[in-house]
Structures are given as C-alpha cells and as structure tokens.
C-alpha cells in the first residue's frame, strides 16, 4: 500500500482532472479522509482548493446527494483551508446552493450554522440559495435560511408569487 504522504504529495490530477481528495470525498467515507489529516500541510493544502474538470472543488463534491458523511467531510476540508462559500466554475453554486437544489435539509441547517457562511451569494444564474429553495417550494429550507437571517424579498417562482419577509 502506498503511504498517504506519497499520495498527497502527488498532486497530478488523473484523467478526470481529480486529485486524491476529490476521489476520497466522492467515493470514500470519513475514515478514508481522516487518514490524510496528519498529511495535509502547507505544501499540499492546495489539493482541497483544486477544481476537477467538471469545475468542482471538494466542498461541492461532498455537498451532492449520496455522499457519505458530508458534514464531517466538510469540517475536515475547512480545517485544510477549503472555502465553505466557494463557487463551482460552471454554475457558480456554493455548497449551500447545492443543498437547496437537492433539498438536503440536514446539510443546509449545518451549513447555515457555520461561521463565515454567506447565505446571500448569487450563482451565475443570479440565484441565491433562498431563491433556489423558493423555486422548489421548499418551505423548510426557506425557513432555515430565514431563521439564520438571510435577506428575503418577493420572488416569482414557477408562476406563483411567494411573499416572504425577514423575521
């Protein structure tokens, strides 16, 4: 078996444009990622910020549905310097946008409780996470975001007007 130190120092992406952290975030569980905890240093911290060929960083990969332990993985990635407000290159979605698009209430709640989270970032389609939740008529995520102080307004979503206010 190749030691984690050697793997982490090999920052060359594979044919999919993914480094080892991209792979572990998508395919591994938290114990696989924890094996790298003592290996990540200033010399290879950039691995947590690299984009794959699909324009996604590790924070976007773990925010997708079907990924094991997304909150725990995000905690580790943030310790390693990953940006919780980082935008993917294709649509400009943040992890919070992805949670709203996929209606992942648990992840949205966790993200909204993180220091430094920006709930008002617009993606490249000029949508905030709140607007995405509004489009999907996901009142639970809308309430989560409102409870944490997101700016709300009047949105026309799917031919219906939703009037919201800041509480």
Swiss-Prot record:
Molecular function as annotated in GO: NF-kappaB binding
Entry keyword set: ANK repeat, Host-virus interaction, Inhibition of host NF-kappa-B by virus, Repeat
PROSITE patterns: ANK_REP_REGION
Biological processes per GO annotation: cellular response to tumor necrosis factor; symbiont-mediated suppression of host NF-kappaB cascade
Domain of life: Viruses
Family of this protein: Belongs to the polydnaviridae I-Kappa-B-like protein family.
Alphabetized PANTHER family for the sequence: NF-KAPPA-B INHIBITOR ALPHA (PTHR46680), NF-KAPPA-B INHIBITOR CACTUS (PTHR46680:SF3)
Role summary: Suppresses the host immune response through NF-kappa-B inactivation. Possesses ankyrin repeat domains required for NF-kappa-B binding but lacks the regulatory regions required for dissociation from NF-kappa-B and degradation. Therefore, prevents host NF-kappa-B release and subsequent activation.
Name used for this protein in its record: I-Kappa-B like protein F2
């Amino acid at each position: 078996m190749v030691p984690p130190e050697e793997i982490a120092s090999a920052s060359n992406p594979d044919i999919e444009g993914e480094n080892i952290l991209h792979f572990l975030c998508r395919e591994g569980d938290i114990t696989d990622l924890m094996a790298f905890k003592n290996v990540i240093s200033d010399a290879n911290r950039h691995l947590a910020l690299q984009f794959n060929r699909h324009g996604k960083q590790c924070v976007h990969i773990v925010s997708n549905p079907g990924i094991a332990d997304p909150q725990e993985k995000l905690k580790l990635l943030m310790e390693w310097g990953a940006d919780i407000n980082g935008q993917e290159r294709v649509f400009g979605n943040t992890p919070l946008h992805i949670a709203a698009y996929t209606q992942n209430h648990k992840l949205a709640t966790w993200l909204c409780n993180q220091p430094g989270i920006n709930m008002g970032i617009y993606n490249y389609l000029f949508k905030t996470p709140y607007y995405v939740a509004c489009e999907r008529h996901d009142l639970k995520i809308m309430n989560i975001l409102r409870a944490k102080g997101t700016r709300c307004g009047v949105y026309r979503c799917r031919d219906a007007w939703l009037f919201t206010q800041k509480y």
